[in-house]
């Protein structure tokens, strides 16, 4: 008897589904791309339970006949290609004929569809890949597909899913990218009957960009349009002031397909050069058009990764065009990018509302009085702040805090820094200090960063906040808004007072007292990027440490700021009291020591 057997259709279907359908966002991608290929001008997506309970996609495309509907759920059945030669010039988003049967293999599906010239439509039901019912139905032209109980017959895969809110955020993020790729199509996303995303389908990319990222970001984008050597480029580059800590806001579209292409993303970053600080990434939406023969999309069932056959040439050409575009435009941020006044309120506003989840309720802060205590200023008063015995004594208390479960530890104690005396400032970056055992060179920014970081951690998770005289409006994309709603308590514990303003808009009313003016929006966006990089592995303690490091970096005295001798000595004294004085929170060295013995050897004594 042969050991090798041909698998039954059900088992083969589940294996194929494992490649194509990784999670709800995979289903959304395949269904929406089918709607796009069908010529839809409007696509509506409804989600329940993050897509695990139900995903509905409604479009006004060409629809299917009864015969095509049945064939569409057969493996390797497609209307997109006819022969192998067509694989060399694919112009549609789908072509493999695997998506619908793979989705049907791990879910329960209901489909209603009608072509424009038909008097009636067709309704069909599938479960576990099997057709269980079919008949006529009255419905508008187009197709409506509802996928229920995703992974109901693969419990191991279902258990591996994230929380519904996280899965829903992934779905919303993908639809946002598709809206950028196809600005001529109107996209809508609804959750429990409430519309959470809408793009107008005007055909203008800037309108879709405003729908995804908000009008504030759209207003700071630089238009790029060029044609060179068979490459057509159309899109927008964000000014350096919009930079992020991850590539989450780089959207690459090739031949109308949203893709991940590291070479193109690197070319976009390379075009900015020194316009961006180290570790920062631009905001960019670029649509490239190349000959279909130069684009291989048949390298993965999900069709998200592609291969450009002249990748190096295309990336080099693109980088040059983008450099020219950035050089031609003013990239200095306008005054409108920064919050006007940027003043803190010492009196606590009664009844400030902090949104803490979708329908989960509103947390109201208790009323508070006013205080006449001094609040330290921003960078211009940095020398005064450095000499204060305890900066916490001069800041109004938080109006509302949660009890800290524990105080985050920031590492085992190491050898203490000896007593140092400041000798000179050279250049206004490093402090030259003398100790009993040699000469010390101290990075003033890294040292102050370490001090602030440990002060934040030592206070636990109940951070004091300062209210802003003028709240900062945050226009987020759907993914960011979902993260903020889900993790709002974490932000509150870190010292941020945030109010949901409706849709994907929030008001930042208060910030940790250490944060200098003008950094409010950027720190929130960086903290949201943290969750994208960590995913489900983000714990509250790790988030608090990361937030403390980010706040400390933005609050510390900068390289190039001149300090008086008393201020330098105060900084050194505070540094010696830290648990880890030799590195900053990001791991960079704070102190370099030249012992007397090393100096004697250098001078050959």
Curated annotation (Swiss-Prot):
InterPro entries: DNA_mismatch_repair_CS, DNA_mismatch_repair_MutL, DNA_mismatch_S5_2-like, HATPase_C_sf, MutL/Mlh/PMS, MutL/Mlh/Pms-like, MutL_C, MutL_C_dimsub. It holds the Pfam family HATPase_c_3. GO terms for biological process: mismatch repair. The keyword Ligase does not apply. Gene3D superfamilies: 3.30.230.10, Histidine kinase-like ATPase, C-terminal domain, MutL, C-terminal domain, dimerisation subdomain, MutL, C-terminal domain, regulatory subdomain. One of its GO terms (cellular component) is mismatch repair complex. Belongs to the DNA mismatch repair MutL/HexB family. This is DNA mismatch repair protein MutL. It comes from Pelotomaculum thermopropionicum (strain DSM 13744 / JCM 10971 / SI). CDD domains: HATPase_MutL-MLH-PMS-like, MutL_Trans. HAMAP family: DNA_mis_repair (MF_00149). Keywords: DNA damage, DNA repair. It comes from the Bacteria. This protein is involved in the repair of mismatches in DNA. It is required for dam-dependent methyl-directed DNA mismatch repair. May act as a 'molecular matchmaker', a protein that promotes the formation of a stable complex between two or more DNA-binding proteins in an ATP-dependent manner without itself being part of a final effector complex. The lineage of its organism: Bacteria, Bacillati, Bacillota, Clostridia, Eubacteriales. The keyword DNA damage applies. GO terms for molecular function: ATP binding; ATP hydrolysis activity; ATP-dependent DNA damage sensor activity; mismatched DNA binding.
């Amino acid at each position: 008897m042969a050991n090798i057997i041909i698998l039954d259709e059900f088992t083969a279907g589940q294996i194929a589904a494992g490649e194509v359908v990784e999670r709800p966002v995979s289903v959304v991608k395949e269904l929406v791309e089918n709607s796009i290929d069908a010529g839809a001008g409007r696509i509506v997506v409804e989600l329940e339970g993050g897509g695990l309970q139900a995903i509905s996609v409604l479009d006004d495309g060409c629809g299917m006949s009864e015969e095509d509907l049945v064939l569409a759920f057969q493996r390797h059945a497609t209307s997109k290609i006819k022969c192998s030669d067509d694989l060399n010039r694919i112009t549609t988003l789908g072509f493999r004929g695997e998506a619908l049967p793979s989705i049907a293999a791990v879910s329960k599906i209901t489909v209603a569809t009608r072509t424009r010239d038909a008097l009636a439509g067709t309704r069909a039901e599938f479960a576990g890949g099997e057709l269980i019912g079919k008949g006529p139905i009255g419905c508008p032209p187009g197709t409506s597909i509802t996928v229920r109980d995703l992974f109901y017959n693969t419990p191991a895969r279902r258990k591996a899913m994230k929380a519904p809110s996280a899965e829903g955020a992934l779905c919303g993020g993908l639809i946002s990218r598709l809206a950028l790729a196809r600005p001529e199509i109107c996209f809508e996303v609804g959750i429990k009957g409430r519309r959470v995303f809408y793009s107008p389908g005007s055909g203008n990319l800037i309108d879709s960009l405003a729908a995804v990222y908000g009008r504030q970001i759209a207003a700071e984008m630089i238009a790029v349009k060029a044609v060179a050597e068979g490459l057509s480029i159309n899109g927008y580059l964000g000014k350096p002031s919009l930079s992020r800590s991850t590539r989450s806001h780089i959207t690459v579209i090739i031949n109308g397909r949203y893709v991940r292409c590291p070479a193109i993303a690197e070319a976009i970053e390379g075009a900015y050069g020194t316009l961006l600080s180290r570790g920062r990434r631009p905001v960019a939406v670029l649509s490239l058009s190349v000959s279909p023969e130069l684009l291989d999309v048949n390298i993965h069932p999900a069709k998200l990764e592609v291969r450009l056959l002249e990748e190096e040439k295309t990336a080099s050409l693109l980088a040059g065009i983008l450099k020219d575009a950035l050089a031609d435009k003013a990239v200095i941020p306008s005054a409108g990018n920064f919050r006007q006044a940027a003043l803190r309120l010492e009196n606590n506003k009664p009844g400030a509302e902090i949104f803490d989840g979708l329908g989960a309720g509103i947390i109201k802060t208790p009323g508070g009085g006013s205080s006449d205590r001094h609040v330290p200023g921003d960078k211009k008063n940095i020398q005064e702040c450095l000499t204060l015995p305890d900066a916490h004594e001069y800041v109004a208390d938080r109006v509302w805090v949660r009890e800290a479960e524990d105080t985050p530890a920031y590492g085992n104690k190491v050898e203490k820094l000896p007593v140092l005396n400041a000798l000179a400032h050279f250049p206004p970056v490093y402090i030259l200090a003398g100790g009993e055992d040699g000469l010390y060179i101290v990075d003033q920014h890294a040292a102050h960063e370490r001090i602030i970081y440990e002060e934040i951690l030592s206070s636990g998770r109940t951070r004091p906040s300062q209210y802003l005289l003028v709240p900062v409006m945050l226009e987020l994309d759907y993914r960011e808004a979902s993260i903020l709603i889900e993790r709002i308590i974490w932000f509150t514990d870190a010292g941020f007072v945030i109010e949901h303003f409706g849709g994907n808009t929030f008001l930042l009313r208060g910030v940790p007292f250490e944060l200098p003016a003008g950094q409010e929006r950027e720190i929130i966006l960086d903290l949201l990027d943290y969750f994208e990089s960590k995913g489900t592995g983000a714990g509250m303690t790790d988030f608090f440490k990361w937030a403390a490091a980010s706040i400390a970096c933005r609050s510390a005295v900068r390289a190039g700021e001149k300090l008086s001798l008393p201020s330098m000595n105060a900084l050194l004294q505070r540094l010696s009291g830290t648990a880890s004085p030799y590195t900053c929170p990001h791991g960079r060295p704070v102190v370099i020591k030249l012992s007397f013995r090393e100096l004697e050897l250098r001078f050959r004594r």
